[in-house]
């Protein structure tokens, strides 16, 4: 099967989602900050909201692939199972004494059961209920409800850990410790799952590499015309962008990258929290963003990159030039600064385009939705009171794997 994402707005054909599950029940007021959520979720309501999101997509002929299903099916393949467990259950993470019983337990699980443990985590008590353990300093120092294998609630935001860039995929190095293990699951899926293993596609970046070179998919927007827009943000570093750029340029698919220097704040952790593409040459942008400095990266000979720094006032011109259009159509909702800040916090600009001029957004951002509608954008709304507590909207919660090319 072919996988390709040539733009942010081409007709969406296939997408990876993750329906929130028992990993959300591991969130507590005490650990939510470490796990990068602003509050604990009401799981049943979050699942209802996510199901509505999926129904909107399937109602527009989008094939929805669920991460948990892909992972469970992948883990039935012995090589994939060993790859994941060797990296997740080992002496470095669990200590020598606890590793053997935990590995024995996980080795004996079905693919679906193992996927559940990898995503939802496992506590000391849950391990001891299932298997006897020798004396272990690691276990002795833990309470019964302490997590020997932490959960991965941020798998909800499938955009970040992997993103398809033109004809290949970037499996991303994550900035925060709470998300680093997500990458291992995606690497196994793309390498061994039958849906992907039979296809040939470039892997632009491998996510388990160590060091400060991080890239997260929420900062990556494939705007078309061989160009990519990337945020230099709280989660994506200049080192990561340069590493990704060198591989994209070597692949010959991308001809330039526009890096946007963002404010490093929680509210604006990724580029897609403040701007997304909604139609040809058209972006919805948070009113409080202003114009930011940009840097244009282009290939320059063998393994070389040229970098041009652009003034903040040239931001729109630089993006338009990369797109090959005369100018951008920038849609900024006219509202006071307090209303704008509230809607940005609630992911008002975090829209998922499923076709040119057709987007999915949270229903709560009434001002932005009405403004976009008045400017010819078809806005499909979904509830997000619970799923939005991790600071992510429809764009964050989706990893497109196939879009139609723009005419």
Regions found by a protein language model. Name each.
Residues 1-407:
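The feature marks the mature, well-folded catalytic cores of soluble enzymes
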């Amino acid at each position: 099967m072919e996988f390709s994402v040539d733009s942010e707005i081409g007709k969406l054909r296939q997408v990876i989602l993750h329906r929130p599950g028992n990993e959300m029940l591991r969130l507590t007021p005490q650990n939510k900050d470490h796990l990068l959520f602003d509050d604990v979720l009401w799981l049943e309501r979050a699942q209802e909201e996510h199901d509505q999101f999926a129904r909107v997509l399937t109602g527009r002929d989008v094939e929805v692939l669920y991460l948990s299903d892909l992972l469970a099916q992948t883990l039935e393949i012995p090589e994939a199972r060993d790859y994941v467990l060797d990296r997740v259950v080992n002496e470095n993470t669990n200590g020598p004494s606890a590793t053997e019983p935990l590995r024995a337990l996980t080795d004996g699980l079905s693919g679906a059961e193992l996927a559940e443990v990898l995503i939802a985590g496992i506590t000391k008590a849950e391990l001891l209920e299932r298997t006897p353990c020798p004396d272990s300093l690691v276990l002795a120092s833990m309470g019964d409800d302490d997590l020997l294998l932490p959960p991965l609630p941020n798998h909800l935001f499938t955009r970040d850990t992997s993103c398809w860039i033109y004809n290949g995929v970037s499996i991303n190095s994550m900035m925060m410790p709470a998300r680093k293990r997500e990458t291992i699951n995606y690497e196994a899926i793309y390498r061994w799952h039958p849906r992907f293993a039979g296809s040939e596609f470039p892997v632009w970046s491998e996510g388990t590499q160590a060091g400060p070179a991080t890239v997260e998919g929420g900062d990556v927007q494939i705007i078309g015309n061989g160009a990519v827009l990337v945020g230099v943000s709280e989660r994506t570093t200049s080192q990561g962008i340069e590493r990704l750029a060198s591989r994209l340029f070597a692949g010959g698919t991308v001809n330039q990258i526009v890096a946007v220097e963002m404010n490093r704040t929680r509210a604006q952790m990724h580029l897609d929290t403040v701007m997304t593409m909604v139609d040809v040459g058209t972006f919805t942008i948070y009113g409080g963003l202003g114009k930011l400095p940009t840097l244009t990266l282009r290939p320059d000979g063998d393994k070389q990159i040229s970098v041009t720094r652009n003034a903040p006032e040239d931001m729109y011109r630089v993006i338009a030039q990369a797109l090959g259009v005369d100018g951008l159509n920038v849609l900024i909702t006219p509202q006071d600064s307090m209303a704008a800040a509230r809607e940005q916090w609630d992911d008002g600009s975090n829209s998922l385009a499923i076709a040119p001029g057709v987007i999915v957004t949270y229903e709560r951002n009434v001002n932005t939705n009405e403004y976009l509608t008045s400017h010819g954008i078809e806005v499909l709304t979904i509830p997000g009171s619970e799923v939005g507590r991790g600071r992510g909207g429809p764009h964050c919660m989706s990893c497109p794997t196939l879009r139609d090319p723009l005419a």
